[in-house]
């Protein structure tokens, strides 16, 4: 039995988040997406935690369900469950630098949330302004506060490589978990990859070798949910999962009833900070070019935003281990390490993007939305379609072009121009004039061939 979890989401009470990020709509989209466990998000916000208490009921195991469940004839196989999680932004000075670190907190019960909130308010933190509050506590002090209230809570550094707001961030982060979390470093048993890195990149970091690598969407709208996810698999066929099961699986405890089976990944090149560069100057560098040319923009002479790939290579142990690829019977390309000590992962392109490119349309167009809904209704869920449904069945429902797009995504047969300095990368299933032009520009700039 497996449970697909997206445990980093935001509510409508966070800045730049869709009004549709409410609990019933999130649950409805979870069925479309193929997600079993969702983050509530934002439980530090006074209005949102009140909505959580009004809309959810405890399932007796540290997870919560809607008091009235949404039903979907084909895609609902289990009740959608919610885990109490929140992202907190810590901005503080340490070691002569300003640090900006974002951490996820997982809570096993509402009582713990309320105690943490009360303690934060007592320390002068403003929890009303944003669902993702900004506080002045260091990561170490935040850990002390949380673990003194409930030792079963978890703290997970989120989007761990983002330049501006993360554990390893090139502009305001640290070089190690020990440096960031101090005496609580041993309690940090996992990190979240973020969109600009994947597990393979994180496997190169020595201190992450024995920690879990998690992936979640950080979605600000329902349609973005599940673009990254972590799948928990039962070791003995259990059909029920608890908060403690998730916690022990992440901690990789021997007595855990579940383990991390695999993760679902965004293409890291599509992330906003994969390469080094300056968006306003339209200038980008690969890690090799950055080592050669430095981190000053040749156009404006200001510091470049150092990308995630370069930062990973800076902190990595000597040499990168080789990726191992395996294609399963559904034509899906899986990636793992040579020793197979880490859970495998798969890189996907969202179904609505495949449909949009196939129809020469946009993801926001009504015809793309209609076909997406039709496919999820008739074939089970987005993740089921992307990973398991026979291509022949997709052809019957959506036509050859969409089916071919899904098949190409499963094989990893796509075109990518990496993102940099806050600009998303470009992913195309079929090479077009835009990709060719971008590749020619990049080749000219970097002196490489595509």
Regions found by a protein language model. Name each.
Residues 28-48, 154-156:
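Divalent metal-dependent hydrolysis catalytic cores, especially in the metallo-beta-lactamase
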Residues 345, 349-450:
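Low-complexity, acidic/Ser/Thr- and charged residue-rich accessory regions of DNA metabolism proteins
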Residues 15-18, 49-53, 165-172, 203, ...:
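Histidine/acidic-residue-rich catalytic or RNA/ligand-binding cores of hydrolases
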Residues 211-227:
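Short acidic/histidine-rich active-site segments
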Residues 66-78, 234-241, 248-259, 363:
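Short, basic, low-complexity termini and linkers enriched in Ser/Thr/Gly/Pro
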Residues 4-13, 43, 215-220:
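Histidine-centered catalytic micro-motifs
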Residues 2, 50-189, 447:
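Extended substrate/RNA-proximal surfaces in nucleic-acid metabolism proteins
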Residues 261-334:
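Cys/His-rich short segments
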């Amino acid at each position: 039995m497996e449970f697909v979890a997206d445990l980093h989401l935001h509510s409508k009470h966070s800045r730049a988040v869709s009004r549709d990020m409410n609990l019933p709509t999130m649950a409805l989209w979870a069925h479309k997406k193929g997600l079993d466990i969702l983050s509530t998000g934002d439980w530090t916000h006074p209005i949102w935690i009140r909505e959580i208490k009004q809309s959810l009921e405890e399932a007796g195991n540290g997870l919560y369900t809607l008091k009235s469940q949404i039903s979907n004839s084909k895609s609902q196989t289990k009740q959608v469950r919610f885990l109490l999680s929140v992202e907190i932004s810590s901005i503080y000075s340490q070691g002569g630098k300003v640090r900006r670190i974002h951490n996820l907190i997982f809570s096993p019960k509402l009582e713990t949330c309320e105690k943490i909130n009360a303690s934060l308010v007592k320390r002068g933190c403003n929890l009303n302004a944003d669902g993702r509050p900004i506080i002045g506590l260091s990561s170490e002090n935040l850990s002390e506060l949380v673990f003194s209230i409930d030792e079963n809570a978890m703290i997970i550094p989120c989007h761990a490589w983002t330049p501006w707001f993360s554990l390893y961030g090139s502009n305001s982060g640290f070089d190690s978990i020990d440096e960031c979390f101090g005496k609580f470093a041993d309690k940090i048993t996992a990190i979240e990859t973020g969109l600009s890195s994947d597990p393979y990149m994180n496997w190169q970091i020595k201190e992450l070798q024995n920690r879990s690598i998690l992936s979640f969407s950080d979605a600000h709208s329902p349609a973005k949910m599940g673009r990254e996810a972590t799948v928990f698999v039962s070791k003995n066929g259990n059909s029920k999962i608890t908060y403690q099961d998730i916690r022990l699986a992440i901690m990789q405890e021997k007595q855990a009833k579940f383990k991390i089976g695999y993760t679902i990944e965004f293409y890291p090149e599509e992330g906003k900070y994969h390469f080094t560069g300056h968006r306003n100057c339209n200038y980008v560098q690969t890690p090799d070019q950055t080592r050669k040319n430095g981190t000053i923009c040749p156009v404006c002479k200001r510091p470049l935003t150092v990308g995630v790939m370069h930062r990973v290579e800076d902190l990595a142990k000597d040499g990168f281990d080789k990726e191992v690829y395996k294609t399963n019977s559904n034509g899906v390309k899986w990636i793992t390490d040579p020793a197979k000590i880490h859970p495998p992962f798969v890189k996907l392109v969202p179904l609505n993007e495949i449909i949009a490119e196939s129809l020469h349309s946009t993801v926001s167009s009504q015809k793309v939305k209609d076909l997406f809904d039709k496919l999820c209704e008739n074939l089970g869920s987005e993740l089921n379609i992307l990973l398991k449904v026979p291509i022949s069945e997709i052809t019957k429902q959506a036509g050859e072009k969409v089916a071919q797009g899904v098949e190409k995504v499963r094989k990893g047969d796509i075109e990518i121009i990496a993102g940099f300095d806050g600009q998303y990368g470009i992913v195309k299933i079929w090479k077009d004039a835009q990709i060719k032009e971008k590749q020619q520009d990049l080749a000219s700039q970097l002196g490489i061939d595509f």
